[in-house]
């Protein structure tokens, strides 16, 4: 994933910063506890597509 794109992207819900988890192929918003998938190097920034994180952040 392009580093410049990561600098621009924010959470669509809270507008906070995202953490890139390469191994899981997702972008994580810690305040919202959501993980947005990355498919074919394209981040899917839709709330309906996001995965809810567990209490331990996984």
From Swiss-Prot:
InterPro entries: Trm112-like. Pfam families: Trm112p. SUPFAM superfamilies: Trm112p-like. GO terms for cellular component: cytosol. Belongs to the UPF0434 family. This is UPF0434 protein Daro_3207. It comes from Dechloromonas aromatica (strain RCB).
């Amino acid at each position: 994933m392009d580093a410049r794109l990561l600098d621009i992207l924010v959470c669509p819900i809270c507008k906070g910063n995202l953490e890139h988890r390469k191994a899981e192929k997702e972008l994580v918003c810690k305040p919202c506890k959501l993980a947005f998938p990355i498919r074919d190097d394209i981040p899917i920034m839709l709330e309906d597509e996001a995965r809810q994180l567990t209490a331990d952040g996984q």
